[in-house]
């Protein structure tokens, strides 16, 4: 008999709506013993079967659901089915948009909670973010090797969130050949170098692909400021859109060096690209005090909030940085501003920008809305999957 997690009375509603998480407060008791990450059955207070998931005894998310089908076992065949289902959408998208790199598995939204897999050419980069994902590592890798024999598999499970569930950070080649130090990929007509070994996330921010493309419509003959530029994807796109100048700002010299290489790789005019290593908050104030002006500003900061206790501070940070950006824009200028914080709702982010405009003494029109690219789907029963939001704003 399998180990069972029994829900408290009345706490089954979210599972009946196929939400993939069970929080600790919903648990009445455990029947049997399960190790960290082991697969368990989840039942209501009367013993009615609801789902099968991965158990994490110390996490606020006590179980993450693998399946709502009682006949489905969690094994190599299960992972193969999920991978093949996800691949169908990515195949269509890659052909339609001319991509060689994309998110293959987007965690819960692809029915594989705690698992992220990005494909860069013939390299699969894996992040296992939960105890259940780690417990199923061998089965998942076997399924990947069978379905993608042409691909090497590289582990980037070196993210701090693993520590919350008592797991060590892991990093390195799992199968196949070692990726080059910098791997060229293609995105909307751009060639970009990505660092699988040490780059942010799995190597690159694939979720901003469509936002980078959208930037081009705003930048012709414009002066652009690219804040938190990382390896210059927005900068390359701005140059391809015909900007007169783009200034890229980041605290990482290594990222800026790759950004410069990306401009050169695309045979764009390097004299129109400036790379500044500095703190964005500090530099924006310096630019304001010097009277610098820009026509377009891209504001793509890292996540400001990890948990609810940090939300108020994050709101202040987002407001301050957007206020400074609005102050630096010429009349009619465009602010492309983003938040990748899952706890920051689109409505709250829009209000923060409105408050920033008031503090800056400017009027702002919202003219376009952004979200993560289509290879990062959001399943309808898991709204938390929509983490990236952004706006194009016209500053009066």
UniProtKB/Swiss-Prot annotation:
Q: Kindly give the InterPro entries that the UniProt entry links to this protein.
A: PUA, PUA-like_sf, PUA_sf, RLMI, RlmI-like_PUA, SAM-dep_methyl-trfase, SAM-dependent_MTases_sf
Q: In terms of domain of life, where is this protein from?
A: Bacteria
Any Pfam family the entry gives:
PUA_3
Q: Which cysteines are joined by disulfide bonds?
A: none
Q: One GO CC annotation, please?
A: cytoplasm
Instruction: List the residue ranges forming a coiled coil, or say none.
Output: none
List residues traversing the bilayer. none
Q: What are the EC numbers?
A: 2.1.1.191
Residue ranges of domain PUA in the record: 2-81
Q: Which reaction equation describes what this protein catalyses?
A: cytidine(1962) in 23S rRNA + S-adenosyl-L-methionine = 5-methylcytidine(1962) in 23S rRNA + S-adenosyl-L-homocysteine + H(+)
Under Gene Ontology molecular function, one entry of this record is:
RNA binding
User: What are the alphabetically sorted keywords of the record?
Assistant: Cytoplasm, Methyltransferase, RNA-binding, rRNA processing, S-adenosyl-L-methionine, Transferase
Compartments where located: Cytoplasm
The function of this protein is: Specifically methylates the cytosine at position 1962 (m5C1962) of 23S rRNA.
Q: Which family does it belong to?
A: Belongs to the methyltransferase superfamily. RlmI family.
What protein name does the entry list?
Ribosomal RNA large subunit methyltransferase I
- Taxonomic lineage of this organism? Bacteria, Pseudomonadati, Pseudomonadota, Gammaproteobacteria, Enterobacterales
